[in-house]
């Protein structure tokens, strides 16, 4: 299969809309975070006169963009494992249940990472919106809002997968913290 990143945008959008399980909500969420990080990187590059660390901000945004983009495929793989595990016949030894649980743990971990990335991107976007090149403020504000939406969507996916698997742990709480941070950054970006 061709990487989602090697496809034209139109083809990726067609795949999202197709009657297939992936890319779905997780892939769209990761792509949204990647787009937000790209906007931060661009705005930072145009803000060298206003921000002494603009180059570092752009470099960090690029790292987050690349990682978020990788998560598009990782989410599709994780969801594929969930579907494969659910398709297994029930067995007395509980192998299917164990495989379903393991698959759902990974399916929750991927969007959790998305929440963390999105919160970082939103914070960076708010900083660039407030102190960067004023001509790029719209791009920075858009990045912050997109990142906050990505964090919220990813946190919902974490909650769904944790509930479906009856998983314990603190992933939902940590995802909710990332959403709160991303929302606060987006509000800061729009208020500056």
Predicted regions located by residue number:
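Polytopic transmembrane helical bundles with strong interfacial aromatic enrichment
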Residues: 4-7, 31, 124, 161-163, ...
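Conserved phosphate/anionic-ligand binding catalytic regions in large, soluble enzymes, centered on
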Residues: 18-39, 136-153
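Residue-level recognition of alpha-helical structural elements
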Residues: 24, 28, 50-53, 57, ...
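Amphipathic alpha-helical interface segments
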Residues: 79-149, 154-155, 161
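A structural-propensity feature for long, helix-poor, extended segments
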Residues: 49-88
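C-terminal auxiliary extensions adjacent to catalytic cores
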Residues: 154-192
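Short, hydrophobic/aliphatic alpha-helical segments
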Residues: 4-22
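Amphipathic alpha-helix face/heptad-repeat signature
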Residues: 31-35, 57, 64-71, 107-117, ...
């Amino acid at each position: 299969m061709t990487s989602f990143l090697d496809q034209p945008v139109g083809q990726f959008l067609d795949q999202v809309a197709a009657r297939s399980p992936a890319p779905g909500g997780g892939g769209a969420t990761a792509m949204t975070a990647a787009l937000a990080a790209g906007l931060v990187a661009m705005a930072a590059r145009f803000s060298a006169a206003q921000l002494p660390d603009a180059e570092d901000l752009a470099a960090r945004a690029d790292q987050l963009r690349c990682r978020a983009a990788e998560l598009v495929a990782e989410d599709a793989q994780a969801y594929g494992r969930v579907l494969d595990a659910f398709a297994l016949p029930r067995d007395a030894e509980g192998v299917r249940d164990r495989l379903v649980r393991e698959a759902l743990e990974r399916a929750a971990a991927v969007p959790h990472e998305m929440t963390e990335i999105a919160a970082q991107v939103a914070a960076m976007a708010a900083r660039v919106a407030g102190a960067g090149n004023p001509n790029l403020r719209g791009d920075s504000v858009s990045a912050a809002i997109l990142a906050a939406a990505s964090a919220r969507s990813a946190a919902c996916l974490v909650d769904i997968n944790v509930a479906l698997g009856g998983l314990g742990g603190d992933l939902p709480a940590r995802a909710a913290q990332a959403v709160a941070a991303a929302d606060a950054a987006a509000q800061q970006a729009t208020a500056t």
